[in-house]
């Protein structure tokens, strides 16, 4: 894939250091479950994996009603750190610098809404500055269901900082082509 990874006969010959960045415990829902499952699969294949999830995912003003959190204990088999604050630009810089210092081979980001673009874009741009880390995006939606005037510039900012994509549908693939020529 990116020089330090060789895939032969279904086995990885080099152990990768991977940071999964996105929803995970204590956040509820399918996105968190998917990210935890992906982390477990990479671990099963022998890679070193950490999940960086949110200290603040959405401000409570944007998440009225139900809780964002599950009421169960954290999984014992995953290293989950609550480090990302999506509404604090100083935090984005700190997380990006931390990743740049830690030099993971891959940061795998989950992207589903342009609301995350400023945060994820800043983190990705800073983390990639070490010349080692590659940012891969597992993307559910490019264009949100409810459109806002900032969607296109936010998407352009984040998607331009990504080295490769895993998309969830042909529609998303088509939408991605309007923003980037990165591998998909």
Language model segments and positions:
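Extreme N-terminal starter segment of soluble prokaryotic enzymes
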Residues: 15-19
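A short, glycine/small-residue-rich beta-strand->loop->alpha-helix junction that serves as a flexible
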Residues: 22-36, 59, 112-117, 146
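N-terminal strand-loop element at the rim of the active site
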Residues: 25-28, 40-101, 172, 177
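Short N-terminal targeting/anchoring amphipathic segment
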Residues: 81-87, 94-118, 133-136
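Helix N-cap/beta->alpha junction signal
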Residues: 111, 141, 169-170
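Nucleotide-sugar donor phosphate/pyrophosphate-binding loop at the beta->alpha transition
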Residues: 131-136, 141-161
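A short, active-site helix/loop in glycosyltransferases that binds the activated sugar's phosphate group
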Residues: 160-184
